[in-house]
Amino acid sequence: MAIGSLSSLGLGSKVLNYDVIDKLKDADEKALIAPLDKKMEQNVEKQKALVEIKTLLSALKGPVKTLSDYSTYISRKSNVTGDALSASVGVGVPIQDIKVDVQNLAQGDINELGAKFSSRDDIFSQVDTTLKFYTQNKDYAVNIKAGMTLGDVAQSITDATNGEVMGIVMKTGGNDPYQLMVNTKNTGEDNRVYFGSHLQSTLTNKNALSLGVDGSGKSEVSLNLKGADGNMHEVPIMLELPESASIKQKNTAIQKAMEQALENDPNFKNLIANGDISIDTLHGGESLIINDRRGGNIEVKGSKAKELGFLQTTTQESDLLKSSRTIKEGKLEGVVSLNGQKLDLSALTKESNTSEENTDAIIQAINAKEGLSAFKNAEGKLVINSKTGMLTIKGEDALGKASLKDLGLNAGMVQSYEASQNTLFMSKNLQKASDSAFTYNGVSITRPTNEVNDVISGVNITLEQTTEPNKPAIISVSRDNQAIIDSLTEFVKAYNELIPKLDEDTRYDADTKIAGIFNGVGDIRAIRSSLNNVFSYSVHTDNGVESLMKYGLSLDDKGVMSLDEAKLSSALNSNPKATQDFFYGSDSKDMGGREIHQEGIFSKFNQVIANLIDGGNAKLKIYEDSLDRDAKSLTKDKENAQELLKTRYNIMAERFAAYDSQISKANQKFNSVQMMIDQAAAKKN
């Protein structure tokens, strides 16, 4: 105790010093603090041991919970013959054999677009143009600027479609090995990419269809398309369909009738053959699409065109160029040219002109030029079209070059899709997007993907290749007992790890008087007996006595549990319903017709464990909380005892110091008197 050093008290006495105080304090600490420390150590040991027991019980609860779950007993597994598909099955699927004939796999659209290049950094186009295509019920127009590289164009396609259609630069080999590919991310016929122009129908007419000529001799339905000679040609369509035909059947018949009519016309025969013009059904046959990948106009003519579902009977032409801004007001200077035809801006505009007046004057001048037309759109901006689909814009002098900006135009060449198709957008379809087609136990089915999970609930199929005729893939669905076997194996392991720990912590040796840390805790001492009581549970049925021993579980004389897996498998295979009833439970009706559920043995195990560790009112949780409270109380008691001793011995030290001072003064006085006595004695001598 580092308070200081006291001299002895009393004449010649060395009793009152700090060594004495420390000895007194040590004695008090042994009497007050040491018992508290011992209790705190025991509390920590109990909390640690309790955590271990709860952990072991949680490990036991895992397999018990599985074995008390109904889904465990209706678990299924599948086996597939052949390589055409893979399959997985969920719980409760009826045990059966499923025959699957795979005619077609779903696939995405793969297209080559444009010429080949020596590098992905080569310039794709020297002109401004627009790539037009349609897929997934949406039209896309990808703006391509002069000077963009092959890689830039590929990325622009991907970005414009949010990755639904991917522009890919592929190295295919040769002197110019790089090729732009336009592919769809997803499979299915609705993911087909249609370049150029298209018309689409949505047929709802359930009546009979008769397509021929009307009273005036005109075709009731005809197709008006650009032929191989570049001119528009009209082709009549003839067809008779009964009322009984479905929408899909009608669209398929219309498709074939249109294709046949075009194939029979020399203007279109080769265009149908090479895919420049195509007619397809979409959306499971609910819709029909006519496509001209050259970008030409498509028109469905005749009095019955709308009866075929063509609400829009002609394609809408896209404008070639829209200015980036409204034309500047006031007088504009300089000369500009459109396709070589000059416009003198100073002659067309005045200082007092508004933007609208300048726009009207310039539009009038453009419309007077050969092959050009212009108008003002709803935004007040200049729109220019060219009969050839090509427009070259140029500033003819310095003022004209500067004034292009005031017109919202840029110098250069602009081409329509149709004008660019033969040079930039020549496309070749390498793989046509299509649905998968297969039969499921004889029923014909189509799906947009090869992942099929909606034919029968719980059966998931992945189509991988087509099957040979009359050699279907067979999915055999059978009972899966492995989860039961695995859970029982885990149950035995967890039980055999828990029991030795319980024995150790609750033991009592009468000879040595040594007791386990939980020897006096009834809730923990009762765990083993509670589990063993459930283990010994049996029930009489029509099939005899049901007990865990029947399923290969047993306890030896040392309390070690074992599992005879062969015996378990035999019992599971011979009567799975009896296993389910004994392990999980069974349902029946009482005399009044009410449903009652008889709990199985593992439901009983689950309840025993839940009462111990689940929730705030679980027995071990309550005991754990009591240990926490005891720990806090002991800590507080120790702090109070330490504070008491500190105060007591601080006061004692202060008093000893005062006594020491008084005795020191008395000693000094005594020494003075002694000196006087000694001096007097010396004089006498």
Curated annotation (Swiss-Prot):
Listed GO biological process terms: bacterial-type flagellum-dependent cell motility; bacterial-type flagellum-dependent swarming motility; cell adhesion
Which keywords accompany this UniProt record? Bacterial flagellum, Coiled coil, Secreted
Q: What happens when you mutate N422G?
A: In strain: KCTC 0217BP
Where in the cell does this protein reside? Answer: Secreted; Bacterial flagellum
Outcome, altering A59S: In strain: KCTC 0217BP
Residue stretches in coiled coil:
618-647
PANTHER family for the chain: FLAGELLAR CAP/ASSEMBLY PROTEIN FLID, FLAGELLAR HOOK-ASSOCIATED PROTEIN 2
Q: What does this protein do?
A: Required for the morphogenesis and for the elongation of the flagellar filament by facilitating polymerization of the flagellin monomers at the tip of growing filament. Forms a capping structure, which prevents flagellin subunits (transported through the central channel of the flagellum) from leaking out without polymerization at the distal end. Essential to colonize and establish infection in gastric mucosa as a result of its essential role in motility. Has effect on flaA gene transcription.
Q: What is this protein called?
A: Flagellar hook-associated protein 2
Annotated organism of origin: Helicobacter pylori (strain ATCC 700392 / 26695) (Campylobacter pylori)
**Gene name of the record:** fliD
